[in-house]
Amino acid sequence: MAINATEKPLGKVFTPDYQLSIPSFQRAYIWKPENILQLISDLEEACKSPETPYFLGSLILVREGDTSFSVIDGQQRLVSLSIIIAALRDLEHDEEWMRLLDALIVEPGDKLRGITSQPRLTLRERDAAFFREYVQEGNLEALFDMNDEDCSSNAQRNIIANTKQAYDALAQLDEEERHRFASYLVNSVTLVIVTTDDLDGAHRIFDVMNMRGLPLTPSDVFKARAMSGLPAAAVDTYASRWDDIMDPLGDDAARVEEFFRYLHLILTHKPATGKLIEDFLSDVLNQYLAGHSIDAFIDGVLAPYAMAWRILERPSDTVLPDDVRGRLEALNDYRHHEWK
């Protein structure tokens, strides 16, 4: 396994040298407004000392081709940085600055050199077209007019909320301040780019280095482990299937963890030990992995129990009889939810 690590400013990452994509087995974009606003605030403070670089952690990439890479760690930051650059671009009045900022998030293409126009960063399949159309290609006005019903995933809702907040925060700066911010972002914000040609090796590196980003949730761990037990040809299909099942449960990590804790109890009749990830893997998921039947777990266990959980969580959204809905709504008013 060949590993290469090099430190680069952001302006040398968002270039034709790195065509980045988020694999389908990765978790969704989960940053909230407070996360992106904190990043903007940190960068505003840092750019007051332009001679001092701002280190934004590492990216772990798997090389898929000469300039094509899958992102194993760094998705949340890369998406958020793209949002910030898109907001800066749309706030800009100078055409040259607009062109330069736009080229950071969308490769403009070069027919002479055979370079096609495409986004620098491609999200997971379910969110890629949305992110490209509204953020990367500069349709922020249309994005700001959207509401939750216009979104097909929690990631898209997070993209809308974070883009609005980033735009409003950067709009508070005058033109000179935004130019100084953008210049610092491109030239002084640095990342350590760790590349390897081996997916398993990339995950081992991630396990060692994942200290800066948001911690993985149990659902993230279970999904990644489940995908590892599928044939390569089935990974994209079942990664999308997993997302279709879990996305309606929301992205509140505590509530999703509660779902898996109760699922573990139902399937094993064992009380919680406080080690959900370890227990669920050993008591439930590993049996399906050993039997090469992860598809049976996803279709026959995860899907129906997630549907039942949604009914218990939001009975008003169901077509259950009125008296049943009323009783479930009353039960949801209790502080303790062990009845589920």
Predicted regions mapped to residue ranges:
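Short alpha-helix boundary/capping and kink motifs at helix termini
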Residues: 1-72, 76, 179-180, 191-192
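Polyanionic (Asp/Glu-rich) segments that form extended negatively charged tracts
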Residues: 122-340
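Hydrophobic, Leu/Ile/Phe/Ala-enriched alpha-helical segments that form helix-helix packing faces
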Residues: 43-47, 92, 170, 174
